[in-house]
Structures are given as structure tokens and as C-alpha cells.
Amino acid sequence: MVDVYQKETARHVMVIDSKSFYASVESVDLGLNPLKSLLVVMSQQENTNGGLVLAASPQAKKVLGVSNVMRQRDVPRDPRLAIVQPRMNYYIQKNKQINDIYRKFVADEDLHIYSIDESLLDLTDSWRYLESKYHRTLTDYEVARIIQQEVRDATGIYLTVGIGDNPAMAKM
């Protein structure tokens, strides 16, 4: 069988997600490691008739069984658990800071912001620039690691990165 796609240009697409974004932002501001802290971002009681968990750190989920949208009354009482109120405008500022870092790797038309914690980067048209900037041939994995490190250094936020030839493959 003839591979009709072999002459097609390989694309470099990444779907990037900030790990437990709201909880991570709050953990960093408290001087805590976002992957190790026990923290939840809880809505105010008067808005939800008891408060809802808007975000939980990975450890709060793992150790205490906290889940997003859990009611305040169902959150385990644990002295190690930090409960903070949401700061939506601040999260928007942090999201802008992260997306500005992405703009160091792609042009605006190749940055697709899907939500406050998820963006798609099509690095295909920037690939030669990136290789000249870093003075070597790069793999998708290496570029993903560079982006993760730049965001972590600037914000303290950890990222997960899906890599593929198209958005669907990168999202998997």
C-alpha cells in the first residue's frame, strides 16, 4: 500500500494543561509545592449554600479523597488541609502570564487558548526558529520540557503536555 501522507510536513502540536490550576496558584503563593500540598479552593458559603470545592491539589485528592465540586460539609476535617477562597481575577492574571510565556514559542495565530488552564500550541511554523534559538535539532519532547521548565521557573506551576501531529492526537 502506498503511503499518500509521507510527503506531508510533520506538524508539532502540543496541548498544555496547568495541573490543578487554581489550587496550584494558591499553593505557590503560600510557599507550598503544588504537587505536595494539601489545599482546596473553596467557594464562599453564601454563594452556594455551604461552599463548593472549586479546585483541589493532587495530594488533597489522593490523600484525603477530595474532589472538585465536593460540598464543604463533605470535605474531611484535617489540620494539614489549607482551605482558601478563590481569587478569579488573580487566576486570570496568572493565566495571562503563562500564555505570554507560550508566545515566546509561537505566534499569536498558533496559540489557541481553550480555558483558563488549557492551551494548544501549533509549533510547526516556529520549529526552525526554535532550533536556531537553541542551536540544535530538537524533539517535541525536548521542546515540551523547555516550556514546562520556563513556566515552572516563572510561576511555580506544573504543566502536563500532550504531543501529536494534530490537536486530536496531542489531546489523547
Residue ranges, per PLM feature:
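Short, well-ordered, mixed-charge alpha-helical segments that flank or form enzyme active sites
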Residues: D122-L123, L130, P167-M172
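Active-site oxyanion-binding pockets that recognize sulfate/phosphate
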Residues: Q85, K133-T137
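Residues that scaffold, gate, or flank divalent-cation-dependent active/transport sites
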Residues: M1-L120, D125-R128
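Fungal eukaryote-biased detector of long internal structured cores
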Residues: K104, Y129-S132, Q149, D153
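Long, highly charged, low-complexity intrinsically disordered interaction regions
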Residues: R136-M172
